[in-house]
């Protein structure tokens, strides 16, 4: 299959360095302390944050001078064509751990001792890039909850398919067997918080793909800031009304 035509267009009409359309909204779960929906093309994730609140495991209360961050990732059974129960499969466990570690890097846990923060993520539609979409949704939900953070945690992926670097792979591209690099950054601090690669690449090629994913992260960070600023304006307008 030809994933990039002679005119330089991918199957969905994007250029190699174009992201899918991003749609995001906060405050979508009324009972949560913070929540968000984040869409990248046809991939859609909802995040809900509860906390900081008292540690539910009493044995850990005296041991923790930092907040405990817990994360649960799941996929809605209608999100893919796979009907098997996915909530407790190995991929969900692995992604829950990766997302938790990524969010711990941005949360100022030392300001909330003896407490816990719960992050729940559910993939409503899966079309590639679910890991990055979950991290971006979690960041929005944490900000919506007023959780203190040292920086935004943002993520994007890029791949290398048929000798071409591609930003923000969709499911068809991701399933084609090329390399996929997922990057998470703290943009203001200029730090990498996540780096995962599912295939070997020559160093020069890796650097190209990594740089492409990093640029995607910066664009997502800008979009997340816009969403949060717009939400702040709406809240101020309601208070003034």
UniProtKB/Swiss-Prot annotation:
Query: Key word Cytoplasm present in the record?
Result: yes
Null allele phenotype: Aborted ovule development after the first mitosis.
Superkingdom of the source species = Eukaryota
Q: Which cysteines are joined by disulfide bonds?
A: none
Q: What is its main location?
A: cytoplasm
Is the Zinc-finger keyword given for this protein?
no
Regarding protein family, the annotation reads:
Belongs to the RNase PH family.
PANTHER family noted in UniProt: EXOSOME COMPLEX COMPONENT (PTHR11953), EXOSOME COMPLEX COMPONENT RRP41 (PTHR11953:SF0)
Name of the featured protein: Exosome complex component RRP41 homolog
